[in-house]
């Protein structure tokens, strides 16, 4: 069967631009009998792990659409011009180069509205393990042909041709040869993208010019889509994201179309072509069989590799040459002595016995040390004890960690799990471990908000600044927010009515248990394990919402605003923005910038791990939660007032007056 490999594909990790979840890309490939897909999100590789998981049975290729500065990337003079260049990892070494490239592009000295590099800096990573192709109308080669990027809005080929450089052939040839020299003769391809030539005549003109350059230089061409959603009909949902991104609505877009005014991201509002097409559709768009066949050549150049790993615990610096297991044993012996007053008090007041404590401690110790978790408990204990040594208040124990007697004996928690009949298995279930990988415990540690930065500094000093970083998290279009975005884009109702409608859509946290049951059922039925908050609200607040939308006996959504509710359900779960995770930090064995992309967090000015918590853990990294709790700050403030007599003095003065 004739086929091709889509090499230029965006997921929802291209925030408010790409719509598709990795699972939707995989489904589309299976529908079209395509062998796999690349993922080339804008300036990031944050979706690599989830994409590889979703592409089970298909070939995933990890790539990135880089932002290339035409000048020295350290110069920030108000010029925001950037070229687009797609780069793919051929193998595991190629992945490491992508990590290094995205990390460097996010350095504060290079980041300027977008993560960016210049070609000279990019060249040092092109050691034969990367494949590059030239890019679309926003590429370096396109800028060598057209002297004005107003070419995007040209209505005819004649208008576009009038914007070409007289010496475009020499300019483009020189640029193409430079890129081939950077990446290597067999690793650079000229990208032919004609999916939207009818709406953008400049695309057809660009393709003609690039094909000429290909013949002149011998650099082969490849055909690509510029997929921002999986299917043509998904275009309408992607436009909701675009309205959010450029703060507009469909009414304004239509008015601009009529008046001829420029529309930001206008191509997406005029076309449904930015999907993953079939081979036959790519031919209909105007690609040649050779260009499509060359995509399979590229795919065959890319090896299979696995980014996941069993946990790689950092080594705790134990004293006196002891192993981590020996040192943990020593601390537990001392902790047992220190906790005797509390343990004996519990024994005297309850039915529990000292033997029960010993058996539980030995059981936990065997389970945790047998799977090599001694270092983890030493790391957690060290952080807590250091904070207390600095006079900081810490929490008594949060969540399932209170079910560990080891943590209680060490003094990490102050909740006796035997006294309160708490289960160790809720904290750590060894039955989840496999021969390939073990699961890590999850200990949430509470600290004063005002002192949290000192904790982070201590951890960085202890394990090395290059091995410790906070991580990013993504906000998603979910429930109430998704419905509001759809209603705003359609100018469907007043702000006040919008609030009345969405008041009946609960927050995710309020119905987390119910949603989890829906997700599990969806998985059992062959789905992706997803659950819609909006649909849950329609089912459970039917009377409240029926004037706007309701579910009929056949399970279909009806009512005056049914289409908007359906669209909001479709975009639920789409990633919307990124920020620094409130609590999670990564402590890694390896230098972080070598194993995961480091990204620039604009709000804090910090460089953080550019992947989500679960993905980082899947790669073998250790996550520690350092939570800031305002109540601890208040308690410390009250203690200080008491300590220095201020509170007593104020009370006396108040009483005397």
Residue ranges and their predicted role:
Residues 1-657:
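Alpha-helical scaffold/interaction cores of sigma-54-like transcription cofactors
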């Amino acid at each position: 069967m004739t086929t091709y490999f889509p090499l230029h594909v965006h997921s929802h990790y291209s925030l408010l631009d790409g719509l598709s979840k990795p699972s939707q890309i995989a489904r589309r490939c299976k529908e079209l009998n395509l062998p796999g897909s690349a993922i080339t999100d804008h300036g990031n590789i944050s979706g690599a792990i989830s994409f590889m998981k979703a592409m089970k049975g298909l070939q995933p290729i990890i790539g990135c659409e880089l932002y290339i500065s035409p000048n020295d990337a350290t110069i920030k003079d108000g010029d925001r011009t950037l070229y687009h260049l797609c780069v793919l990892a051929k193998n595991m070494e190629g992945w490491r180069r992508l990590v290094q490239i995205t990390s460097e592009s996010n350095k504060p000295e290079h980041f300027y509205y977008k993560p960016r590099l210049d070609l000279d800096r990019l060249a040092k990573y092109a050691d034969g393990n990367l494949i590059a192709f030239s890019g679309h109308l926003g590429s370096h080669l396109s800028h060598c042909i057209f002297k004005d990027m107003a070419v995007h809005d040209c209505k005819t080929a004649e208008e576009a041709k009038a914007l070409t450089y007289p010496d475009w052939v020499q300019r483009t040839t020189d640029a193409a040869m430079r890129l081939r020299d950077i990446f290597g003769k067999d690793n650079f391809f000229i990208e032919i993208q004609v999916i939207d030539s009818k709406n953008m005549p400049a695309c057809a003109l660009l393709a003609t010019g690039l094909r000429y350059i290909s013949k002149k230089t011998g650099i082969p061409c490849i055909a690509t889509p510029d997929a921002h959603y999986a299917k043509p009909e998904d275009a309408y949902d992607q436009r909701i994201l675009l309205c959010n991104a450029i703060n507009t609505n469909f009414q304004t877009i239509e008015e601009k179309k009529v008046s001829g005014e420029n529309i930001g991201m206008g191509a997406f509002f005029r076309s449904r072509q930015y999907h993953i097409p079939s081979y036959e559709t790519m031919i209909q768009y105007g690609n040649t069989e050779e260009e499509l066949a060359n995509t399979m050549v590229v795919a065959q150049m890319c090896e299979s590799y696995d980014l996941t790993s069993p946990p790689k615990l950092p080594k705790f610096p134990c004293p006196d040459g002891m192993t981590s297991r020996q040192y943990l044993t020593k601390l537990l012996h001392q902790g047992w002595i220190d906790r005797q007053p509390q343990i004996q008090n519990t024994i005297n007041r309850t039915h529990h016995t000292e033997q029960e404590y010993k058996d539980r401690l030995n059981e936990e110790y065997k389970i945790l040390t047998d799977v090599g978790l001694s270092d983890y408990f030493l790391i957690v204990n060290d952080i807590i004890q250091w904070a207390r040594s600095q006079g900081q208040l810490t929490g008594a124990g949060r969540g399932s960690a209170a079910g560990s007697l080891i943590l209680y004996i060490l003094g990490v928690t102050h909740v006796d799990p035997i006294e309160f009949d708490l289960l160790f298995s809720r904290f750590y279930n060894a039955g989840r471990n496999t021969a390939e990988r073990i699961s890590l415990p999850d200990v949430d540690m509470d600290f004063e908000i005002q002192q949290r930065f000192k904790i982070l500094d201590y951890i960085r000093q202890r394990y090395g600044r290059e091995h410790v970083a906070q991580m990013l998290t993504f906000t998603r279009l979910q429930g109430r927010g998704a419905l509001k975005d759809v209603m705003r884009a359609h100018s469907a109702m007043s702000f006040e009515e919008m609030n009345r409608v969405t008041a009946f859509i609960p927050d995710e946290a309020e119905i987390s248990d119910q949603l989890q049951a829906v997700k599990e059922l969806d998985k059992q039925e062959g789905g992706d394990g997803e659950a819609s908050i909006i649909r849950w609200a329609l089912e459970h607040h039917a009377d409240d919402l029926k004037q706007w939308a309701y579910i009929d006996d056949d399970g279909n959504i009806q009512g005056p605003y049914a289409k908007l509710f359906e669209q909001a359900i479709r975009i639920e779960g789409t990633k919307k923005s990124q920020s620094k995770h409130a609590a999670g930090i990564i402590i890694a064995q390896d230098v972080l910038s070598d194993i995961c992309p480091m990204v620039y967090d604009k709000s804090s000015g910090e460089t953080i791990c550019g992947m989500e918590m679960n993905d980082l853990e899947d790669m073998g990294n250790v996550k520690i939660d350092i939570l800031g709790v305002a109540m601890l700050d208040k308690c410390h403030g009250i203690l200080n007032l008491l300590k220095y007599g201020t509170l007593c003095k104020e009370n006396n003065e108040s009483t005397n007056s």
